[in-house]
Amino acid sequence: MTYAYLFKYIIIGDTGVGKSCLLLQFTDKRFQPVHDLTIGVEFGARMVNIDGKQIKLQIWDTAGQESFRSITRSYYRGAAGALLVYDITRRETFNHLTSWLEDARQHSSSNMVIMLIGNKSDLESRRDVKREEGEAFAREHGLIFMETSAKTACNVEEAYINTAKEIYRKIQQGLFDVHNEANGIKIGPQQSITSSVGPCSPQQNVSDIGPDSGCC
């Protein structure tokens, strides 16, 4: 299938926060409760529709273990978007966000779009990080923020789509050099897409997602 652009994503965060599950839910629409630890990187891809254009998302799921951080760093280069994930039931994964963010910004393009994700929102009774804390961290560091559940699929689609919308907005503003693939964007074989039907229904804009739009 032809596409207007290809956007490269990287998923980062501590081990066990649900990075692989978020990828699987988005690409295959299924949840795998028992998942082997990612060794190095895993890969997934899916087409989405942004403003009537077909966009191919190429997603790299990275290992969270410290021993693989050097491998992970090499994938920051050439990524247009990053999903920075923590587990709302494990405070330490939230505390480590600053380290992950420093790594991402040191080794990536300054225009890379970063979506902060508080995953496992289905485990509300075990919550250890308040939603307001995630929102505050995102505001402080200029990130987009959502809480998701890879198990129920709540907000998973929106997280990927809204990241792509922000990347596309930056392209429209001329902030990304789309002719330089080091920025994580590749012009597709057919940039004019005549089909108006995509695999995803229209999603809310980031600005439309208020503090009350949590998972059901």
Swiss-Prot record:
<keyword id="KW-0968">Cytoplasmic vesicle</keyword>
<dbReference type="InterPro" id="IPR027417">
    <property type="entry name" value="P-loop_NTPase"/>
</dbReference>
<dbReference type="GO" id="GO:0000139">
    <property type="term" value="C:Golgi membrane"/>
</dbReference>
<dbReference type="GO" id="GO:0000421">
    <property type="term" value="C:autophagosome membrane"/>
</dbReference>
<dbReference type="GO" id="GO:0007030">
    <property type="term" value="P:Golgi organization"/>
</dbReference>
<feature type="binding site">
    <location>
        <position position="17"/>
    </location>
    <ligand>
        <name>GTP</name>
    </ligand>
</feature>
<protein>
    <recommendedName>
        <fullName>Ras-related protein Rab-2B</fullName>
        <ecNumber>3.6.5.2</ecNumber>
    </recommendedName>
</protein>
<keyword id="KW-0342">GTP-binding</keyword>
<comment type="subunit">
    <text>Interacts (in GTP-bound form) with GARIN4 (via N-terminus). Interacts (in GTP-bound form) with GARIN5A. Interacts (in GTP-bound form) with GARIN1B. Interacts with VPS39 and VPS41.</text>
</comment>
<feature type="binding site">
    <location>
        <position position="120"/>
    </location>
    <ligand>
        <name>GTP</name>
    </ligand>
</feature>
<feature type="binding site">
    <location>
        <position position="38"/>
    </location>
    <ligand>
        <name>GTP</name>
    </ligand>
</feature>
<feature type="region of interest" description="Disordered">
    <location>
        <begin position="189"/>
        <end position="216"/>
    </location>
</feature>
<feature type="binding site">
    <location>
        <position position="38"/>
    </location>
    <ligand>
        <name>Mg(2+)</name>
    </ligand>
</feature>
<dbReference type="GO" id="GO:0005789">
    <property type="term" value="C:endoplasmic reticulum membrane"/>
</dbReference>
<keyword id="KW-0636">Prenylation</keyword>
<dbReference type="GO" id="GO:0015031">
    <property type="term" value="P:protein transport"/>
</dbReference>
<dbReference type="InterPro" id="IPR050209">
    <property type="entry name" value="Rab_GTPases_membrane_traffic"/>
</dbReference>
<dbReference type="GO" id="GO:0016236">
    <property type="term" value="P:macroautophagy"/>
</dbReference>
<keyword id="KW-0931">ER-Golgi transport</keyword>
<comment type="similarity">
    <text>Belongs to the small GTPase superfamily. Rab family.</text>
</comment>
<keyword id="KW-0378">Hydrolase</keyword>
<feature type="binding site">
    <location>
        <position position="122"/>
    </location>
    <ligand>
        <name>GTP</name>
    </ligand>
</feature>
<feature type="binding site">
    <location>
        <position position="150"/>
    </location>
    <ligand>
        <name>GTP</name>
    </ligand>
</feature>
<dbReference type="GO" id="GO:0005886">
    <property type="term" value="C:plasma membrane"/>
</dbReference>
<dbReference type="GO" id="GO:0051607">
    <property type="term" value="P:defense response to virus"/>
</dbReference>
<dbReference type="GO" id="GO:0045921">
    <property type="term" value="P:positive regulation of exocytosis"/>
</dbReference>
<feature type="binding site">
    <location>
        <position position="20"/>
    </location>
    <ligand>
        <name>Mg(2+)</name>
    </ligand>
</feature>
<feature type="binding site">
    <location>
        <position position="21"/>
    </location>
    <ligand>
        <name>GTP</name>
    </ligand>
</feature>
<keyword id="KW-0256">Endoplasmic reticulum</keyword>
<feature type="short sequence motif" description="Switch 2">
    <location>
        <begin position="63"/>
        <end position="72"/>
    </location>
</feature>
<feature type="binding site">
    <location>
        <position position="16"/>
    </location>
    <ligand>
        <name>GTP</name>
    </ligand>
</feature>
<keyword id="KW-0333">Golgi apparatus</keyword>
<keyword id="KW-0449">Lipoprotein</keyword>
<dbReference type="GO" id="GO:0016192">
    <property type="term" value="P:vesicle-mediated transport"/>
</dbReference>
<dbReference type="Pfam" id="PF00071">
    <property type="entry name" value="Ras"/>
</dbReference>
<dbReference type="GO" id="GO:0003924">
    <property type="term" value="F:GTPase activity"/>
</dbReference>
<dbReference type="GO" id="GO:0005794">
    <property type="term" value="C:Golgi apparatus"/>
</dbReference>
<dbReference type="InterPro" id="IPR005225">
    <property type="entry name" value="Small_GTP-bd"/>
</dbReference>
<dbReference type="GO" id="GO:0045087">
    <property type="term" value="P:innate immune response"/>
</dbReference>
<dbReference type="GO" id="GO:0001669">
    <property type="term" value="C:acrosomal vesicle"/>
</dbReference>
<feature type="binding site">
    <location>
        <position position="64"/>
    </location>
    <ligand>
        <name>GTP</name>
    </ligand>
</feature>
<feature type="binding site">
    <location>
        <position position="19"/>
    </location>
    <ligand>
        <name>GTP</name>
    </ligand>
</feature>
